[in-house]
Amino acid sequence: MRPQDAPFRPHWWATGMSELGVEARPDVGTYGRYEFADLPPVPFALDGDLSWLEPLPSQEEWPITGNAATEFGALLAACGRTGTPLPAAFAKFMADEALQGKVRSSTGCFIDLDRAPVRVEGGGCFVRFLADQQGCLFWYLYVTEDGADHAVVCSPEYFDSEEHDVAGDLGEVSFSAESFEAFLCRYWLENEIWFASVGDGEMPDVGAEYLERYREPDGA
């Protein structure tokens, strides 16, 4: 889904990068809400198969592995009942704990998979899949009403299928990525850049180029 086609304003919730020379990412606390238009492109071809993720090493500390092993089956069943299609990359990732263990979070986020979609006021549905450890932010798949497209959105609001028949209060929901794979790729890369900056791991080969492009005023 393109940002201009989404019913939510585009922003990228993440940590600051001012110490790495990215003026567009001032440090404003654990998370800042940054301009989506300033983001550089992700440095891999995204074909829906997560081929860029598969060769990466597993992480012993701070992996985002959470409850997918126990909840993904229930989510699949619920989506089958409601006719809600899940993106191929999302299904592959949530079904494979080894893939989940390759992605880590500098803020302690973890997979917090809902057991069913939540209908969205105005059309479509949310599927929660990632949560900040302190409950500051939550990330959701947004699947359109006809199921033909999806995006990733982020909100400080907690939408859960056992608590909400319909997700309202959408004013704080931000469009965060054109697809689940695009979100996962950027999330992985930016967290690895952070860990490398504090001496906990090597800078990814594509990390320096990503930062250089981000430092340019137009984000190109």
Language-model features: locations:
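A surface-exposed partner-binding patch
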Residues: 1-148, 157-159, 217-218
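Intrinsically disordered, low-complexity segments enriched in small residues
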Residues: 1-8, 185-188, 194-202
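Charge-dense, low-complexity intrinsically disordered regions
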Residues: 12, 199-220
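Short, flexible coil/linker elements and helix-boundary hinge sites characteristic
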Residues: 21, 80, 192, 199-201, ...
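A short secondary-structure junction signal
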Residues: 138-143, 164-165, 195-196
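Compact, glycine/acidic-enriched structural inserts
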Residues: 150-194
